[in-house]
Regions:
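Helix-to-loop junction immediately C-terminal to a conserved catalytic motif
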Residues: 49
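ABC ATPase NBD coupling module
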Residues: 69-85, 189
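Short coil-to-helix segment of the ABC ATPase nucleotide-binding domain corresponding to the Q-loop/switch region
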Residues: 97-105
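Conserved signature/switch motifs of ABC ATPase nucleotide-binding domains
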Residues: 137-140, 158, 190
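Conserved ABC ATPase signature
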Residues: 138-142, 146-148
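Catalytic Walker B motif of ABC-type/P-loop ATPase nucleotide-binding domains
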Residues: 163-166
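Helix N-cap at the start of a conserved alpha-helix in ABC-type nucleotide-binding domains
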Residues: 174-176
Length: 228
């Protein structure tokens, strides 16, 4: 079990956003989190990588990648985040360097030392997302879809057990968005779970997954797909 939440209350500041959340995610699962703007999708995802705190008196259990989030120490959060890949709607690439150096920076800052291993891993992830011919380009020279593919490559660098994608297609045209979700769906075949928030319901129908909906302060399981 990669995620195991039992009766968790989730707050944004002092405001209760989601109450009594029960949620599990398993290896290789594709999970959608849907709901209106402001319904709690992003808040839920932020708890996974400790961007939002959770409280022991407001939950029975909150575990991610075998770490107890109700008792995790600040110094242990970076190690937890290294076991997951995080993808944002606005890409968050470093614009002062090319694609290769963007990925190089991540590997060096997460403890990789051997230059040959670094080079091999960068080439592997760029090939995985179909961007191996773009490694010398700077972000501003790429389309939105290409930048998001690079962001996915970055998320894959440390061979994460799960990927957390917060509205990864929100700034993309429909065809490009389709290609990005197809790529994320394909990634689950390697055993990596993908948790993706979206309000693109046609995409949810096209690429099957387990669907949770944030609605009226609750997280509701609305569709189960055993192969997702």
């Amino acid at each position: 079990m990669l995620v195991d939440y039992q009766n968790v209350n989730i707050y944004q500041g002092e405001e209760l956003i989601l109450r009594d959340v029960c949620w599990t995610v398993e290896e290789g699962q594709f999970v959608y989190v849907i709901g209106k703007v402001g319904s709690g999708k992003s808040s839920l995802l932020k708890t996974l990588y400790c961007e939002l705190d959770m409280y022991s008196d407001e939950a029975n259990k909150a575990e991610v990648l075998d770490k107890n989030l109700l008792a995790i120490k600040r110094k242990d959060i970076p190690a937890l985040r290294r076991q997951m890949g995080i993808i944002f709607q606005d890409f968050q690439l470093l614009h002062d360097r090319n694609v290769y150096r963007n990925l190089y920076f991540v590997l060096k800052s997460t403890g990789w030392k051997n230059s040959g291993d670094i080079d091999n891993r960068i080439n592997e992830v760029l090939q995985q997302v179909g961007m191996e011919d773009k490694k010398d380009k700077r972000p501003h020279e790429l389309s939105g879809g290409e930048q998001q593919r690079i962001a996915i490559a970055r998320a894959l660098l440390n061979k994460p057990k799960m990927i957390v994608a917060d509205e990864p297609t929100g700034n993309l045209d429909p065809e490009t968005a389709d290609n990005i979700v197809s790529l994320l769906h394909h990634i689950t075949e390697t055993g990596t779970a993908v948790i993706m928030s979206t309000h693109n319901l046609p995409m949810v129908d096209k690429y099957p997954g387990t669907v949770y909906k944030c609605d009226k302060g609750e997280l509701q399981l609305t569709r189960t797909n055993k192969n997702a």
